C-alpha cells in the first residue's frame, strides 16, 4: 500500500466515522437503534450503495469485529454491579446454556425446512444466530431504568452466552467438514466445559492479577486505561488460545475491576466509554461494508420467515423453558426478556467461521445471519421502549446529578464530586445549609450562583438556579439526588408504584378494614414484609409486583436488599 492509498484509506475511514456520529441523533428521533445507523452507513458506502467500495476481506472483518467486541465487553463488565448477580446469575446462566441450545434447535429445524438444507446445516444456521449480542444489548439498555432482575438477566446473559454458541458452531463445522469424524458425547462435553471453565478461571484469575498490577503501578493518569485495555486483551487472547471463551474472560475481567477499588477507575471508565463508541462504529461500519444487499434479495421471503420464527417462537419458548425453575419472574418479565433477544455482531462474526473453513453453502449462512441481525435490530431494537412500557418493567426515572467525577486522592479512592442544579420546586430553596439533613460523610464543597463561586458557610441560603458541587461516595448518591436533583414528574411515581404507600412492618390485620382484605389463620399474623417474601421470594427488587386479593402490590422502596415500603394500586387503577 503506497502513501496515496494510505491517505485515501484514512480519508474514507474518517469520513464514514464522522458521518456515523453526525447521524446518530437521527436514531433517537426515528426510534431505531443507533447500531443500525452505523450498519446502514457501512452498507451505503459498500458495493451496492452510492459509495461503491468493494470490500470482501472476511479475515480483516473478523479481526476488527473481535477486537471491537472485546473492548465493548470489557467496558460493559466494568459498569455491571456485582450486586445484580444476587438476583440474576442463575437465570442468566440458564438462558446462556439451555436457552441457546433450545433456540439453536428450533431455529435449525426451521432453517432446514425453509432452505431445503441437511438437518446438520440447519442446526449450524441455528447455532450461528442462537446467541444474543452483548454489543447490541449493552447499547440499547444503557441508561434505561429497568427492573433490576430483568435488566441484569439480559446483560449477564448477553455477556455469557457466547461460549455455548461458539461451542455449537465450531462442533457443527467440524462435523460438516469431516462427516466421518467421530465426535463422541464425552468429547463434546469436555469441549463445552473447557470453554466455560477456562473462560471463567482466566477471567477471574487474570482480572485479579490485572487489578493488583494496576493498584501497585505508579503511572501517568492516562496510562492506567491503556494498561487495563492491553491487559484485558491479553487475557482475552490467552483464553481463546487455550481453548476457553475469550469473550467470557474479558467480560469477567471488566466485572472484577469495576467492582473493586481500582486506581484511576474513573479515568479508565471515561477512556473506555470513548473506545466503546469507536469500537461500535468501526465494527458495524466494517460489517456493513462486507454485506452485498443484492445477495439478500434471493432469500428475503424465507429469511423473513426464519427471523420472525426465531423472534416469535424459538426465543420465547427457550426463555419460558429456561426460566421455569425461577418463580420470581412474572409473565411480563418473561415476555420482555423474550422480546429483547437482540442479535448483532456476534452472529455475523460466527457466520465468518464457515467462510474461513471453506464449507459449501458458507455464503448462504453469512447472508442469513446478516438478514436475521437486520430484522432483529429493526423490529426488536426499535420497539424496545414500547415493549418495556407494555411489560411494565421500566421504572420511573430516578433523580440524578447533572454530572459526576472521581476525586482520586488515594490509589483506591471512592470519593466523587456530584454536581446538582437546583430547580425552583426543591424544598431546600431559601434554607440555610446548616439546616439541611445531609447524609453522613458528605459535604457541599462549592456553590455557584450566576457564574460566580460562593464560599459556602452554615448560614448560606440556597437559591433556585444554584449549582452545587457535593463531595461524597456512591452509597450516598440516592439520598443526595433526592435532596438536590430535579425530581421526576410527580405523576409518574404514583402511576407506576400506586397511590398508597405502606411500611412493610405494618400488619395485614391493620390493613384489612381499610382495603377489605379477607384474612385467615395463616395470614392474620403476617406483616406486609411477610406477604412480600411469600409472594416474591427472598430477593425482591424495586418495581416487583404481584396481585393479591384483587389489589396490585408493588415494591416501592428498598434499603440494602430489604423491602422498606410497598405501593398499592386499587383494581380500577391497575
Swiss-Prot record:
Record-linked InterPro entries: Cation/H_exchanger_TM (IPR006153), FAD-bd_PCMH-like_sf (IPR036318), Na+/solute_symporter_sf (IPR038770), NhaP2 (IPR023729), RCK_C (IPR006037), RCK_C_sf (IPR036721), Transptr-assoc_dom (IPR005170)
The species this protein was found in: Shewanella sp. (strain ANA-3)
Residues of the RCK C-terminal domain: 405-486
Residues that span the membrane, as ranges: 6-26, 34-54, 58-78, 87-107, 109-129, 173-193, 196-216, 219-239, 242-262, 271-291, 299-319, 335-355, 359-379
Pfam families recorded: CorC_HlyC, Na_H_Exchanger, TrkA_C
PANTHER family in the cross-refs: K(+)_H(+) ANTIPORTER NHAP2 (PTHR32507:SF7), NA(+)/H(+) ANTIPORTER 1 (PTHR32507)
Name the UniProt record assigns to this protein: K(+)/H(+) antiporter NhaP2
NCBIfam families cross-referenced by the UniProt entry: PRK05326.1-1 (NF003714), PRK05326.1-2 (NF003715), PRK05326.1-3 (NF003716)
Amino acid at each position: 500500500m503506497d502513501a496515496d492509498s494510505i491517505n485515501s484509506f484514512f480519508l474514507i475511514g474518517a469520513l464514514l466515522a464522522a458521518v456515523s456520529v453526525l447521524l446518530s441523533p437521527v436514531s433517537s428521533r426515528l426510534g431505531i437503534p443507533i447500531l443500525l445507523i452505523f450498519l446502514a452507513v457501512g452498507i451505503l458506502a459498500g458495493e451496492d450503495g452510492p459509495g461503491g467500495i468493494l470490500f470482501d476481506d472476511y479475515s480483516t472483518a473478523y479481526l476488527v469485529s473481535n477486537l471491537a467486541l472485546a473492548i465493548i465487553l470489557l467496558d460493559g463488565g466494568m459498569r455491571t454491579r456485582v450486586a445484580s448477580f444476587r438476583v440474576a446469575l442463575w437465570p442468566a446462566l440458564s438462558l446462556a446454556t439451555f436457552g441457546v441450545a433450545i433456540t439453536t434447535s428450533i431455529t435449525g429445524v426451521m432453517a432446514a425446512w425453509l432452505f431445503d438444507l441437511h438437518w446438520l446445516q440447519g442446526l449450524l444456521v441455528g447455532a450461528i444466530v442462537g446467541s444474543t449480542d452483548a454489543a447490541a444489548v449493552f447499547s440499547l439498555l444503557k441508561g434505561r431504568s429497568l427492573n433490576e432482575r430483568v435488566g441484569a438477566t439480559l446483560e449477564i446473559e448477553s455477556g455469557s452466552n457466547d461460549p455455548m454458541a461458539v461451542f455449537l458452531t465450531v462442533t457443527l463445522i467440524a462435523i460438516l467438514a469431516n462427516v466421518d469424524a467421530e465426535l463422541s458425547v464425552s468429547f463434546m462435553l469436555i469441549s463445552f466445559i473447557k470453554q466455560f471453565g477456562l473462560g471463567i478461571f482466566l477471567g477471574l484469575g487474570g482480572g485479579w492479577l490485572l487489578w493488583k498490577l494496576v493498584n501497585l503501578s505508579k503511572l501517568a493518569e492516562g496510562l492506567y486505561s491503556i494498561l487495563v485495555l492491553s491487559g484485558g486483551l491479553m487475557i482475552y487472547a490467552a483464553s481463546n488460545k487455550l481453548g476457553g471463551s475469550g469473550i467470557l474472560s474479558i467480560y469477567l475481567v471488566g466485572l472484577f475491576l469495576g467492582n473493586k477499588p481500582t486506581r484511576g477507575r474513573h479515568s479508565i471508565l471515561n477512556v473506555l466509554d470513548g473506545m466503546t463508541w469507536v469500537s461500535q462504529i468501526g465494527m458495524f461500519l466494517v460489517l456493513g461494508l462486507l454485506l452485498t444487499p443484492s445477495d439478500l434479495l434471493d432469500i428475503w421471503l424465507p429469511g423473513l420467515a426464519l427471523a420472525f420464527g426465531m423472534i416469535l417462537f424459538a426465543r420465547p419458548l427457550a426463555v419460558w423453558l429456561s426460566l421455569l425453575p425461577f418463580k420470581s419472574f412474572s409473565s411480563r418479565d418473561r415476555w420482555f426478556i423474550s422480546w429483547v433477544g437482540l442479535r448483532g455482531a456476534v452472529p455475523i462474526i460466527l457466520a465468518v467461521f464457515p467462510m474461513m473453513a471453506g464449507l459449501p453453502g458458507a455464503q448462504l449462512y453469512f447472508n442469513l445471519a446478516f438478514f436475521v441481525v437486520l430484522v432483529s435490530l429493526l423490529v426488536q431494537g426499535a420497539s424496545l421502549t414500547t415493549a418495556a412500557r407494555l411489560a411494565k418493567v421500566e421504572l420511573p426515572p430516578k433523580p440524578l446529578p447533572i454530572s459526576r467525577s472521581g476525586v482520586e486522592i488515594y490509589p483506591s479512592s471512592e470519593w466523587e464530586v456530584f454536581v446538582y442544579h437546583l430547580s425552583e420546586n426543591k424544598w431546600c430553596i431559601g434554607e440555610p445549609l446548616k439546616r439541611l439533613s445531609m447524609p453522613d460523610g458528605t459535604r457541599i464543597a462549592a456553590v455557584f450562583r450566576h457564574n460566580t463561586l460562593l464560599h459556602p458557610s452554615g448560614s448560606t441560603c440556597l437559591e433556585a438556579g444554584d449549582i452545587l458541587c457535593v463531595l461524597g461516595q456512591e452509597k450516598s448518591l440516592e439520598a443526595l439526588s433526592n435532596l438536590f436533583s430535579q425530581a421526576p414528574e410527580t405523576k409518574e411515581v404514583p402511576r407506576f408504584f400506586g397511590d398508597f404507600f405502606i411500611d412493610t412492618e405494618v400488619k395485614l390485620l391493620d390493613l384489612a378494614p381499610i382495603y377489605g382484605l379477607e384474612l385467615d389463620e395463616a395470614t392474620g399474623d403476617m406483616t406486609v414484609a411477610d406477604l412480600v417474601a411469600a409472594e416474591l421470594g427472598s430477593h425482591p427488587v424495586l418495581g416487583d409486583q404481584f396481585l393479591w386479593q384483587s389489589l396490585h402490590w408493588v415494591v416501592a422502596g428498598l434499603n440494602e436488599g430489604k423491602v422498606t415500603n410497598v405501593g398499592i394500586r386499587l383494581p380500577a387503577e391497575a
